[in-house]
Design a protein with these regions (language model features):
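Terminal, low-structured helical/coil segments at or just beyond the last alpha-helical repeat
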Residues: 202-253
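Canonical tetratricopeptide repeat
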Residues: 39, 73, 107, 141-143, ...
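Bacterial Sec signal peptide processing site at the extreme N-terminus
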Residues: 15-37, 253
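Structural marker of alpha-solenoid helical repeat scaffolds
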Residues: 29, 63, 97, 131-133, ...
Length: 253
């Protein structure tokens, strides 16, 4: 009797599971819930509430394990949790589900470079940059350059920064990277030209102004160094870059 009852209950349960898996309305409801829980999980992740983020993203995966958005968000979570094996798995799964999504390619590239896998990181940055669906290819080329710099491939990095600037001439971080490399390698005239040209026609940043001070100072151009130092102190008085001026011994006042 008990065996028969157990068999009946298992049969009913199996029928309900199959019904839930095949009912289009229930599937749509679960997928909508997964979208909602993914958004909540990402919001918690951005606020640093990792336990709540994991709870919501685990729930989202149960609701729709084949969503690339869910897998991508989980990859970012596992990266924050310092679980590289699980992060890798989730990144791979997201790219399996959406192999041409440039945002997933870029996110995975950032993760790879931050974990020291530079060559693979550059590969995925370039895939994102060359993807016609990617709205900010200059960012990906710039990121590839930063990744190459971390591996001390400065010549290849310069090409990436120049490509980024060819796409977006207003890209201040690429200008800084390019001029800083020239400064590092003693190409002061080239660094001077890049900085002056940009700062005379585009919006300044504290990092660019400090680099300009250093380049002018290295060239022995004390007057221009002081002028850029003054701009830095006036426009960004509380910045780390303004505080760094004291190490150069310049009197901008």
């Amino acid at each position: 009797m008990r065996s028969a009852l157990r068999g009946l209950l298992l049969g009913v349960l199996g029928t309900l599971v199959l019904y839930g898996c095949s009912n289009p309305q229930l599937i749509r409801q679960r997928h909508r819930a997964a979208v909602y829980n993914t958004e909540l999980g990402v919001a918690y992740l951005q606020r640093g509430e990792l336990a709540l983020a994991k709870e919501k993203l685990d729930q989202a995966e149960r609701e729709n394990p084949d969503s690339p958005n869910v897998q991508s968000a989980r990859a970012l979570l596992f990266e924050r949790l310092r679980e590289p094996a699980r992060a890798d798995h989730a990144f791979h799964r997201a790219l399996e589900l959406a192999p041409r999504n440039p945002d997933y390619q870029n996110d995975y590239a950032v993760y790879l470079c931050s974990s020291g896998r530079y060559a693979r990181g550059v590969k995925y940055f370039l895939e994102a940059a060359r993807n016609p669906l990617y709205l900010t290819p200059a960012d990906a080329f710039d990121n590839a350059g930063v990744c190459l710099r971390a591996e001390h491939h400065d010549a290849a990095a310069i090409k990436m920064f120049k490509t980024a600037l060819a796409i977006n001439p207003e890209f201040s971080s690429a200008v800084w990277e390019l001029a800083e490399l020239d400064y590092k390698h003693g190409r002061l005239k080239q660094a001077h030209s890049e900085l002056v040209q940009y700062l005379s026609t585009h919006h300044e940043t504290a990092s660019l102004l400090l680099l300009a001070v250093r380049v002018m100072h290295a060239q022995g151009d004390t007057l221009d160094a002081v002028l850029y130092a003054r701009r830095l102190q006036l426009d960004y008085p509380d910045s780390p870059q303004a505080r760094a001026l004291s190490t150069l011994g310049l009197n901008s006042g």
